[in-house]
From Swiss-Prot:
It is found in: Plastid. InterPro entries: Ribosomal_uL16, Ribosomal_uL16_bact-type, Ribosomal_uL16_CS, Ribosomal_uL16_dom, Ribosomal_uL16_sf. Keywords: Plastid, Ribonucleoprotein, Ribosomal protein. NCBIfam families: rplP_bact. It comes from Helicosporidium sp. subsp. Simulium jonesii. Belongs to the universal ribosomal protein uL16 family. This is Large ribosomal subunit protein uL16c. Part of the 50S ribosomal subunit. The lineage of its organism: Eukaryota, Viridiplantae, Chlorophyta, core chlorophytes, Trebouxiophyceae. It comes from the Eukaryota. It holds the Pfam family Ribosomal_L16. One of its GO terms (molecular function) is structural constituent of ribosome. One of its GO terms (biological process) is mitochondrial translation.
Amino acid sequence: MIYIPKKIRYRKHHRGRLKGVASKGNNLFFASCGLQALESSWITSQQMEAARRACTRKVKRHGKLFMRFFPDKPVTYRSAETRMGSGKGTPRDWVAVIKPGKILYELKGIPEPLARKALKLASAKLPLKTKFIFKKE
């Protein structure tokens, strides 16, 4: 499943810079354990889905997985060997801009050792360093 916004205001965005830390979405909200980003990066919708699948396969569809980010930024590409000029390329991918401290995934209703293994599998599919965080209740 590819994640794409239903409606967007502008078809093409500036690329922007990855700086600063996450001010929102940096605390566990839905569950007691989660995966937190340690560096900034773009995560594509394909990477999101691969990580989600790896995690749900490990826990055998028990518990509940919460994804705390969504790819809402279009990334454009020019075809290879194209001359300079003639406008910006067409949007091809959708990415989520991730900053350090952002909670990516949360797992609920699963024992901590199994959740740790599942989220480690998910982190292997992502292009950034992450850490497992656990909230004692």
